[in-house]
């Protein structure tokens, strides 16, 4: 059973600064880290490996220069995957969901897989699109919002997901793509033994050309900016007469 767990390197939120001039975000001092939601996918993949006959877990990511960081690679491998594949190319530096999904699908096809796991979204964009797009591109079943994996056989995965007022149980034929929610597990903190052992695990570095990827994005990200801050007006209307109610309604209309 070959399981691929996808992850994304994202800027550490606490290091992101806001430029006062135009509200744009400054990522220059932000270290890269594994997207919090993908930690659940990595943990789920490694738990499934224990159930699968001859299970193997491959961590897979596409991106820019952040993926060259040796510390980041070691962090991923210390969490349980048997190997790591990173696809590094400048065009993936600010990739949007469609481009990311296309590259992940191409890389997964090259690596070979029975099951692909990913987080429901990423810590930066949280578009919640990539997992479903990968399934669509590969023309295989794709399910998101999975909160529990019940069982795994050679050809079927049975899962649960929480809907608004009910719990849905699904049997998914393999190969498939599953996007897991944060409810599925609590990611473990790697032990010192796991951290030291991560350095011995194989890492493959591919380029966009290696996976036959040469598609140009139909659109590109132009700017990421923080919401403009509005000063509070601190309008206090005293009394409960008709004039006060009318004044309240008038001020309310101005802000909606």
UniProtKB/Swiss-Prot annotation:
UniProt GO BP: carnitine metabolic process
| Purpose | Required for anaerobic carnitine reduction. May bring reductant to CaiA.
The similarity annotation says: Belongs to the ETF beta-subunit/FixA family.
**NCBIfam families per record:** PRK03359.1, PRK12342.1
Which intervals of the chain form a coiled coil? none
Lineage of source species: Bacteria, Pseudomonadati, Pseudomonadota, Gammaproteobacteria, Enterobacterales
Record the organism.
Escherichia coli (strain SMS-3-5 / SECEC)
Task: Reply yes or no: does the keyword Transport apply.
Answer: yes
Q: Which SMART domains match?
A: ETF (SM00893)
Q: What is known about its subunit structure?
A: Heterodimer of FixA and FixB.
Which keywords does this Swiss-Prot/TrEMBL entry list? Electron transport, Transport
Q: What is this protein called?
A: Protein FixA
**Gene Ontology MF annotations:** electron transfer activity
Q: In which pathway does it act?
A: Amine and polyamine metabolism; carnitine metabolism
The highest taxon in the source lineage is Bacteria
Q: Quick check: keyword Transferase in the entry?
A: no
């Amino acid at each position: 059973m070959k399981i691929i767990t996808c992850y994304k390197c994202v800027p550490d939120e606490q290091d992101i600064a806001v430029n006062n001039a135009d509200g744009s975000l400054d990522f220059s001092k932000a270290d890269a880290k594994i997207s919090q939601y993908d930690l659940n996918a990595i943990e789920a993949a490694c738990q499934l490996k224990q159930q699968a006959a001859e299970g193997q877990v491959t961590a897979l990511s596409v991106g820019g220069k952040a993926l060259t960081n040796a510390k980041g690679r070691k962090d991923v491998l210390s969490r349980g995957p048997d190997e790591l594949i990173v696809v590094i190319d400048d065009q993936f530096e600010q990739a949007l969901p469609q481009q990311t999904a296309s590259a992940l699908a191409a890389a997964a096809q090259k690596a070979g897989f029975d099951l692909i796991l990913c987080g429901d979204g990423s810590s930066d964009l949280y578009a919640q699109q990539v997992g479903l797009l990968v399934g669509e591109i590969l023309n295989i079943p794709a399910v998101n919002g999975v909160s529990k994996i019940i069982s795994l056989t050679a050809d079927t995965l049975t899962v649960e997901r929480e809907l608004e007022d009910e719990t849905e149980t699904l049997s998914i034929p393999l190969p498939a793509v599953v996007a897991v929610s944060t409810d599925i597990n609590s990611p473990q903190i790697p032990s010192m033994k796991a951290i030291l052992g991560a350095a011995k695990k194989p890492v493959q570095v591919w380029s966009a050309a290696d996976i036959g990827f040469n598609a140009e994005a139909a659109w590109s990200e132009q700017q990421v900016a923080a919401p403009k801050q509005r000063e509070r007006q601190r309008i206090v209307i005293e009394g409960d007469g008709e004039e006060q109610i009318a004044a309240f309604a008038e001020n309310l209309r101005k802000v909606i």
